[in-house]
Each structure stands twice: as structure tokens, then as C-alpha cells.
């Protein structure tokens, strides 16, 4: 009989500390839900994820009579994952009145805490969960009362029989990151919110392709070019009379990873949709969903890193080679401490973003906090996406040949990780977005302010090293601002700035961080990414690894 694994919520002290700080008095009410998710993800969820990956969705275009149906046939394991994720309240945590006492004033903290645990088991279906949250968010913020009443309760449902899932259809053949090239046309209407239009065009990369409620960009007839001419529409899969809407799923993609859910190509042939925001508003509204997706992407990245650390440590504690456990071999001890340290810092940094989103969403955030969230979001997404791929690759290597075999989880974890630096903006696109925030909203000012404040709460050695590196970053930014052809160096600058932000956040006692273990991990990451000299001065111990990973 297989031994039941410890709940991933119970085994990560840093996560419990962060959620306790952000949820406040609601934490005790939320704990049973978090414990259940952590237990389910570590056990049944991990098994279902493996099964769903190996038994991906299948598109059925026609029924036995030849009628077009465009339905997706899911393996039973995916349905079980839906029950764990949606039924466990990931989306409901933000919107469903039944969970109000558990979330308090920190709906996103509870959503992301649950989601982080779920993503350790299944990063794939975490994408549809994210899209469902994003659709609900846009409807709550910008939808008419009629649209809100029709869709939001079902997007926030924990009952699969009433659940609607969401999606975001942006990408076309001619434009991925270049959204201004969108050629899908909206016909009819006069710009009144909630009005019905007909959509014509093609969408090329549509994740959760059979979603019930789809946010979609299109250009109204006669509207101008670029993103300013785009409107945002709500596209239902099924019309109010129960009939299929007029769009076709042409095929589903054969993806490297995230194979449990369908990403497809869609043709719109007069599909009915409802206006959410017209030209001048639509793209900016969609950007709100995109930024939420970027925060989800960061949380998924930390989840992938955590799973990689857990699997690597579990193996290293058991495997004996050359007369001792492999965790006791110095080179592997160093590798494991690097992995655990990066994952711990990633967790603390990502939940800094979650805290800011909750604060800004509640309406109590200052202009400084809004600007901080704007600057932090693209950095979180791109840095942690890259870290996730590296840490997952190290995890595969720790397991050696077993890590490379699909019977074990790490091969899937690595395949799933590779999409994290890609969707919601590739690394270079996000660097450019960070520089837009820097130029238009003084993003560098809030970044420097946070780094300086948090560094002042760090031990003197960290404070001194960060101060020197921050001065270097400030001087480099002046150079960049004086060179109109300096775009080639933007990524170097943002990598360094993000490193300093990550390290100092871990040391910030004002955020509830700054424990001895947090600081140990921060020193480790700082020394690795901004080394002084060729050879490391500190030596990792097995106890260091266990402490950073679990205490």
C-alpha cells in the first residue's frame, strides 16, 4: 500500500507564514481549505496530473450524424483535477460570497495560496483556472449588471455542474505579442456597453479552447489601427437559447508541455459577442486580465520550482551512491541549496506582488503602491519563469535517468515549465514592458525605494553588497537613458534590478520576512547571481538544505 505523502501546505513553513501575514484573522478560517488542497495536490492530484498528461484531450468535430459539434473529450483524470482546483475554491476564493470569511480582505492571497499548491501537482490546468479568474475579474470591474449576473456566479462556482470556465483569445497568425495587428472584425453595434455584435476572423493560439466565457479582442468596423482601435468583447460558447455560438474549433495544438488541457485554433463566423469596452478602452481592459495572468504565471513558476525541489530532495534523501546518501555529496548539496534558496526567494517575492494586488484592488492602495505593482508585475513574470525552467532542469538532473523518463514526474514538470517564459509575454517583451513602466510611470523610482527600504532591514553584509550593486544599477540606468540605441542592454539591467528586489524582499522584516533562514537563502542567491570572485566562500550543509526547503 502506498504511503500517503505529507500535505504540501503543512510541509512548507514559509508559505504558512506568508499566508498568515496576508490573510490576518481570516487565516484560521482558511486553513482547513488550504490543508485539504495541500493534501489533495500532493497525493491524488499528483497522480491525476500524470494521467491527464499521458491521456490528453481529443477534439471531436462531428457527431455520429455528421452534425458539427466541436466538443472536447477529456480523460476522467482531468475532470478529477477540475474538482480539486475549481471545487477546491481557487477562483471562488476571490468572488464567491460563500468564501468571504476565509478570504477576509485578501481574496487574491487565498486564491494564489490555493493555486500555488494546486500548480505543484498540475501546472497545466492552472492556466484555465487563471483564465476563469481573469474573465470574472473583467466582468466584475467593467461588465454591465446583466453580464455580471449571467456569468460571474458561474465562473466563481465550486460545483462542476454549474461551473463556467473562462478563456482569453488574443493571438492571431499575424500577431502574437504585437496585439495591434489583430484583424478580427466586430460588425454591428454603436458602442453601447453590453450590446451584441457579430465577430468574424481567426484566432491562432486559444488556451482552454472550449471555455464557456471568452474574453476576445476585435476591431469594430471603421475603427482605427493599432491597439487604440480594438474593442473587448465577451464571447459565450453557448447562446442563451442553448444553441452553439457561430465559431469553429479547427484543431487543437500538439504542445511540448501543458498537455492536459486543449489549446486550439478557432474560426469566428458571425459569432455573437457582447461589448465590454470599445476602442480606447478595450485594450487597456484586456491588459488588466493580462497582468493578472502574469501574476498567475509567476505563482505557477514558484509551484514548478517547489515541486522540483521536493522531488529532488526526496530522491537525494533515499538514493545511496558511493557509500552514502547522494544528498551528502558536497557538489549535490550545493546544487540542492541553490534550488531551495531560489524557490524560497521566488515564493516571498511573488507573494509581495499578490499583497500589492489585494491592496490596490481593495481601493486602499496609494499611488506609490499602484506604481510598484505596475513595475513589479512584468519582472515577476519573466524572472520567475526563467528560474522555473532552470530549477526544473536541475531537478531532472538530480534524478538522473529516472528524471528523464515519463514514468516519473520530473520530465513532465520540465516540459510544463518551458511555457512559463513564453505566454503572457516572452522575456524580451516583458523587459520592454518594464522599461515602459520605468519611462512612463517612474518605475525605477519605486523599485529603488523598495530595494533601499528592504535592504535597510537586512544584515550589514547583505546591506553593504546590495548598496554597491544598487549604485551600479543607478549609474547604468543613467547611461541607458542617454543612449537612444541602448535597447540591447535593457535585459542586463532588469536582471540585476530584479535580483536586488528579490533578495531584499526576503530580508524585509516589515513584510514578515527576514528570518535567519530567509536571510540564508538571500545570501545564497545573491552570491550565485552576483558573485564576488570565482570561488564560493560558504559551504552548503545538508541541514542548510533542509532548513531552507522546509523551515
Regions found by a protein language model. Give the residues of each.
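Alpha-helix capping/hinge segments and adjacent helical runs
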Residues: 6, 13, 18-50, 374-453, ...
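Extended, charge-enriched "interface" segments that sit outside catalytic cores
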Residues: 1-104, 465
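C-terminal helix-coil-helix/basic helical segment that borders enzyme active sites and/or dimer interfaces
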Residues: 344-381, 478-490, 508-512
Amino acid at each position: 500500500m502506498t504511503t500517503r505523502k505529507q500535505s504540501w501546505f503543512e510541509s512548507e513553513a514559509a508559505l504558512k507564514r506568508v499566508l498568515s501575514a496576508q490573510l490576518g484573522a481570516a487565516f484560521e478560517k482558511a486553513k482547513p481549505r488550504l490543508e485539504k488542497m495541500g493534501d489533495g495536490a500532493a497525493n491524488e492530484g499528483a497522480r491525476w496530473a500524470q494521467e491527464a498528461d499521458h491521456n490528453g484531450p481529443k477534439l471531436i468535430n462531428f457527431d455520429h450524424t455528421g452534425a458539427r459539434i466541436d466538443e472536447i473529450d477529456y480523460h476522467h483524470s482531468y475532470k478529477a483535477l477540475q474538482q480539486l482546483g475549481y471545487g477546491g475554491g481557487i477562483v471562488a476564493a476571490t468572488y464567491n460570497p460563500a468564501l468571504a470569511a476565509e478570504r477576509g480582505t485578501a481574496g487574491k492571497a487565498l486564491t494564489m495560496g490555493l493555486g500555488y499548491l494546486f500548480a505543484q501537482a498540475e501546472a497545466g490546468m492552472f492556466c484555465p483556472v487563471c483564465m476563469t479568474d481573469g474573465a470574472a475579474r473583467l466582468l466584475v470591474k467593467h461588465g454591465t449588471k446583466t453580464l455580471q449576473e449571467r456569468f460571474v456566479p458561474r465562473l466563481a462556482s465550486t460545483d462542476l455542474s454549474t461551473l463556467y470556465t473562462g478563456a482569453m483569445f488574443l493571438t492571431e497568425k499575424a500577431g502574437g505579442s504585437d496585439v495591434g495587428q489583430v484583424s478580427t472584425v466586430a460588425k454591428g453595434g454603436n458602442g453601447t456597453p453590453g450590446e451584441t455584435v457579430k465577430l468574424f476572423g481567426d484566432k491562432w493560439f486559444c488556451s482552454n479552447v472550449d471555455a464557456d466565457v471568452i474574453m476576445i479582442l476585435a476591431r469594430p468596423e471603421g475603427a482605427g489601427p493599432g491597439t487604440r482601435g480594438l474593442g473587448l468583447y465577451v464571447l459565450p460558447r453557448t447562446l442563451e437559447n442553448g444553441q452553439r455560438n457561430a465559431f469553429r474549433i479547427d484543431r487543437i495544438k500538439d504542445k511540448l508541455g501543458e498537455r492536459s488541457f486543449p489549446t486550439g485554433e478557432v474560426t469566428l463566423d458571425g459569432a455573437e459577442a457582447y461589448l465590454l469596452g470599445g476602442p480606447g478602452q478595450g485594450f487597456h481592459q484586456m491588459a488588466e486580465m493580462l497582468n493578472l495572468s502574469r501574476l498567475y504565471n509567476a505563482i505557477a513558476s514558484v509551484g514548478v520550482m517547489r515541486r522540483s525541489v521536493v522531488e529532488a530532495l526526496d530522491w537525494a534523501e533515499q538514493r545511496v551512491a558511493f557509500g552514502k546518501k547522494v544528498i551528502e555529496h558536497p557538489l549535490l548539496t550545493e546544487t540542492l541549496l541553490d534550488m531551495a534558496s531560489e524557490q524560497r526567494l521566488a515564493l516571498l517575492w511573488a507573494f509581495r506582488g499578490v499583497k500589492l494586488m489585494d491592496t490596490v484592488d481593495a481601493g486602499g492602495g496609494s499611488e506609490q503602491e499602484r506604481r510598484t505593482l505596475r513595475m513589479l508585475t512584468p519582472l515577476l513574470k519573466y524572472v520567475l519563469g526563467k528560474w522555473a525552467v532552470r530549477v526544473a532542469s536541475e531537478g531532472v538532473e538530480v534524478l538522473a535517468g529516472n528524471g528523464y523518463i515519463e514514468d516519473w514526474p520530473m520530465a513532465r514538470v520540465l516540459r510544463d515549465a518551458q511555457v512559463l517564459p513564453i505566454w503572457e509575454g516572452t522575456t524580451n517583451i516583458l523587459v520592454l514592458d518594464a522599461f515602459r513602466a520605468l519611462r512612463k510611470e517612474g518605475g525605477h523610482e519605486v523599485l529603488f525605494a523598495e530595494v533601499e527600504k528592504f535592504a535597510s532591514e537586512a544584515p550589514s553584509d547583505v546591506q553593504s553588497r546590495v548598496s554597491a550593486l544598487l549604485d551600479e544599477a543607478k549609474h547604468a540606468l543613467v547611461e541607458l537613458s542617454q543612449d537612444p540605441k541602448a535597447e540591447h542592454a535593457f535585459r542586463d539591467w532588469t536582471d540585476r534590478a530584479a535580483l536586488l528586489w528579490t533578495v531584499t524582499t526576503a530580508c524585509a522584516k516589515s513584510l514578515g520576512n527576514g528570518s535567519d533562514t530567509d536571510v540564508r537563502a538571500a545570501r545564497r542567491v545573491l552570491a550565485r547571481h552576483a558573485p564576488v570572485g570565482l570561488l564560493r566562500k560558504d559551504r552548503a550543509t545538508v541541514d542548510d538544505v533542509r532548513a531552507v526547503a522546509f523551515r
